[in-house]
Curated annotation (Swiss-Prot):
Record protein name field: Serine hydroxymethyltransferase
SUPFAM superfamilies: PLP-dependent transferases
Highest classification ranks of the organism: Bacteria, Bacillati, Bacillota, Bacilli, Lactobacillales
Gene3D superfamilies: Aspartate Aminotransferase, domain 1, Type I PLP-dependent aspartate aminotransferase-like (Major domain)
Residues forming coiled coils: none
Organism of this sequence: Lactococcus lactis subsp. cremoris (strain SK11)
Gene name of the record: glyA
Principal subcellular localization: cytoplasm
Residues annotated as transmembrane: none
In-chain residues carrying the UniProt-annotated modification N6-(pyridoxal phosphate)lysine: K230
Binding site for (6S)-5,6,7,8-tetrahydrofolate: L121, G125, H126, L127, S355, P356, F357
GO cellular component: cytosol
Any single GO BP term: tetrahydrofolate interconversion
Catalysed reactions, as listed in the record: (6R)-5,10-methylene-5,6,7,8-tetrahydrofolate + glycine + H2O = (6S)-5,6,7,8-tetrahydrofolate + L-serine
Keywords of the record: Amino-acid biosynthesis, Cytoplasm, One-carbon metabolism, Pyridoxal phosphate, Transferase
Amino acid sequence: MIFDKEDFESFDPELWAAIHAEEIRQQQNIELIASENIVSKAVMAAQGSVLTNKYAEGYPGKRYYGGTEAVDVVENLAIDRAKELFGAKFVNVQPHSGSQANAAAYMALIQPGDTVLGMDLNAGGHLTHGASVNFSGKTYHFVPYGVNPQTELLDYEEILKIAKEVQPKLIVAGASAYSRLIDFAKFRQITDSVGAKLMVDMAHIAGLVATDAHPNPLPYADVVTTTTHKTLRGPRGGMILTNDEVLAKKINSAIFPGTQGGPLEHVIAAKAVAFKEALDPEFATYIEQVIKNTQAMADEFAKVEGLRLIAGGSDNHLLNLKVLDLGINGKEAQDLLDSVHITLNKEAIPDETLSPFKTSGVRIGAAAITSRGFKEAEARKVAQLVSNALVNHDNQEKLEEVRKAALELTHQFPL
């Protein structure tokens, strides 16, 4: 039985109220969190389908349960579409998340205690790239690399120097808060010079890679991991890609039975839908607009005294701002903007002096507002609203003006 809204509300009013409140929040808030997006009705329909009832441990054609003919078709569709989308020979669509994908990739590539290079959190790296509180930092010996202190860009010569000093078994390229292009060819040269493997986490830029708006890491990386949401605009989940048959077998074993049991076939179906959408030429137009909107916002922020664009701007879907010089930290900025219907997140910056719970900066992404229909004019308006709120963070009258303007903008572009 499939509940409609009225049935759901009647059956579980408390849960329905919470879901409805979130629906209203999404309708009324300008979403700038770089890792969030707005999926299609088709993606949601697939994820809410009867496939959620089916257990399917194993892989298509090699399951540990019967009755898997239909889910085999579903999973193979997702695999084949991902191969076409990214030019990969082998794809595993079963990871429940990006973190699960990274965990399995590490298991396939290295041994516990091995030395790994990963991007420092303050420079834009992810928890799974070696943070001491994360499984990655607890299981493997991660050595961080950062960015040039002056340019705040990846310093490939410095990364090479570190690699030669520590002789890693693996180098991880990719980030969760880096706004510039990543040169995967240079990373390949570095890994080859020390006899290491190269893993690329393209979770944030997968949508850009799919449309050639960012260089594809697959020709250079031994393994590529990603999420399927963010710029790819699919369901929350993970994926692993490689062109190496031997590694593909190790990856499959690392996912099942290594780190997961039954795959979420309803989510895999939603991934298949998202990949089909991403193969449509309209998706390339969408990504092009995402980049235009990001750059339009960057141009506006650059005009504001007291705000600093980290790395001088953006080549992708996100940008980072230092807000501390305005007399407000990242957490305070996040809470302040949330109160005026603008959602973003606090973010550490390369020269960070505050704790991860406060931070000196914020991260801003254009994927969700672009899905909503915003173009450059609206993106510039959004940047102006954010700037006005931050500059006037103690002025309730100005903040009320921002709140009303933000609501008006979301009403003009309903979900």
